[in-house]
């Protein structure tokens, strides 16, 4: 069974039909919609600020979602796919976006609706990826 842990008076909340892998860790101020899947060795750390996840989201193995104390939150829209070993730190991912395996998305970045972040990408703080953009075609740093 996944580790579900209350922190600072916040207990994670989940919608209907969510799959939580046995060794996933969901901590603190995390709210997730229905029909989501959180895969093996994934960590959702809502210990210092909030994480909000829409409906139909899948976050694959080994990913880490965390925020910056009192400065950034994570908002993930509906029907988003987050690949294996992704780090999202205090960013916003809009509906229907895809974050490729091994990518890192930093504080206050915004990935637009339907946008694709290629595997291995680094999306720097405050970067805005427009809706339906594919950034980049090959992995490299995306600069604001």
Regions found by a protein language model. Give the residues of each.
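Glycine-rich hexapeptide-repeat left-handed beta-helix
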Residues: 1-14, 19, 41, 47-64, ...
